[in-house]
């Protein structure tokens, strides 16, 4: 499960969701793709993302993200919010499953040498605006947030190449 902040019926909720977006309209959840990334450039067009983009945006808390053996974090090591989409699938028996994915964009100059995409990072202070469902004008106002975060307040550290043999060794990768 992934921790996500969402707004529903005017109230913000923190909840655990399954990673990989399962659209609410899917008939058979076992046969449906469950993307973990949604490209910012196509979220308004693709059927899987169109509804969540309009009504179900979420925030995913993070202290860093990984790309090709590197950890990218804020220089001050503070938490930040990744832009996400969520949806609720309701089964024939009434059971509910909430799922989410992260929105990606082109990379900034720090991430570009590592990968051609990076997560969308919501600018500090704009979290509530991101969560607010809205009409076309509101969504168009969100589009500037879908661009790469500036490289300056970020830091990129190479991780040790060896994979951990057990859970206790994982922390040593960051030494």
Where are these regions (language model features)?
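A structured binding-face within diverse protein domains that lines the active/interaction site
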Residues: 1-175
């Amino acid at each position: 499960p992934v921790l996500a902040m969402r707004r529903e019926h005017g109230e913000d909720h923190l909840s655990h969701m399954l990673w990989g977006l399962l659209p609410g309209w899917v008939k058979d959840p076992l046969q449906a793709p469950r993307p973990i990334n949604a490209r910012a450039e196509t979220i308004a067009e693709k059927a899987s993302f169109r509804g969540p983009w309009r009504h179900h945006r979420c925030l995913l808390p993070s202290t860093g993200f990984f790309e090709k053996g590197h950890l990218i974090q804020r220089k001050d090591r503070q938490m930040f919010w990744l832009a996400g989409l969520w949806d609720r699938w309701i089964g024939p028996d009434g059971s509910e499953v909430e799922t989410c994915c992260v929105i990606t964009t082109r990379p900034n100059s720090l991430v570009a040498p590592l990968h051609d995409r990076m997560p969308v990072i919501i600018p500090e202070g704009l979290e509530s605006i991101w969560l607010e469902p809205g009409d076309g004008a509101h969504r168009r106002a969100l589009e500037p947030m879908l661009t790469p975060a500036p490289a300056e307040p970020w830091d990129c550290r190479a991780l040790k190449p060896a994979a951990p043999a057990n859970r206790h060794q994982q922390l040593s990768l960051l030494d």
